């Protein structure tokens, strides 16, 4: 068999082999291409026979070799495309979606229990004629402490472990700075000031079941003429009844806060045992709920308010504590862990 016949036979055999490769035969296709057209392939071996040909036959056979190479290269490229398309089609078929199957139900979101509690408390105060005022979470030491009758050398500063950013800038430890700023701007010729300031506050507490390094407070302030301790008690009684039910009672116990004088701790009659004593109230019949008092005259004077003419009261309560008492939650960390099993209980 002469060289021309061998070249023609190689072309035909290779083309027949290529057409038999269907589906995912990419490796076999590559191996075939190397065995035919590679540096040590069949076509290269045939080319070695050119040296034995006459001078007249060499250009003829050389041309035929190039034609065979071109035909086979084109055939390999086409077959590679076919094999690749077959792979893609097989993958699509294996991953096909049955459009008749029911879809996955998206979970509907709901307002967080702290958001619900905050909105309920704010609605109570709005109904009582209070205005709601927001303030800065990053605050000046001056407004957070000094304006609350806590100068830099005051021992009561040790009552609050503080996150300081600089010597004069900190994360607020209460929302009282909002009251100081509002008191500075209030025009008493238009009437008394009645405000609440809700928001996040920060303390350097170790997180456990009853403590958190961040929590939510809502603090109230009323300043006007002839404001008395009786006004404070009446306001607190109304708030507690709206939060915990009309049958609830309160009691005031003497306490100490630098920014109020006199100061009181406010207890509410236990809503589980009705005051008889149980595990919730630790057998006392009462549950501590908030702190309050008459605004210290020095706090008023620092805002330019005449403490001889005006007086006021202030109070502060924790929203997490209210929610924990109302819903029987025994671990404050549940509010912040993002566990849907916890959150879905309060839809």
Swiss-Prot record:
Q: Which reaction does it catalyse?
A: tRNA(Phe) + L-phenylalanine + ATP = L-phenylalanyl-tRNA(Phe) + AMP + diphosphate + H(+)
Q: Which GO terms describe its biological process?
A: phenylalanyl-tRNA aminoacylation
SUPFAM superfamilies in the cross-refs:
Class II aaRS and biotin synthetases, tRNA-binding arm
Q: Per the entry, which co-factors are needed?
A: Mg(2+)
Cofactor binding note of this UniProt entry: Binds 2 magnesium ions per tetramer.
If you read the UniProt record, what top EC class would you report for this enzyme, in one word? ligase
Q: Which Pfam families match?
A: Phe_tRNA-synt_N, tRNA-synt_2d
Listed EC numbers: 6.1.1.20
Q: Which residues bind Mg(2+)?
A: 261
User: Where does this protein reside within or beyond the cell?
Assistant: Cytoplasm
Q: InterPro entries per the record?
A: aa-tRNA-synth_II, aa-tRNA-synth_II/BPL/LPL, Phe-tRNA-synth_IIc_asu, Phe-tRNA_ligase_II_N, Phe_tRNA_ligase_alpha1_bac, Phenylalanyl-tRNA_Synthase, tRNA-bd_arm
NCBIfam families per the record?
Answer: pheS
Question: Self-association or partners: how does it assemble?
Answer: Tetramer of two alpha and two beta subunits.
State the name under which the record lists this protein. Answer: Phenylalanine--tRNA ligase alpha subunit
Q: Which organism is it from?
A: Streptococcus uberis (strain ATCC BAA-854 / 0140J)
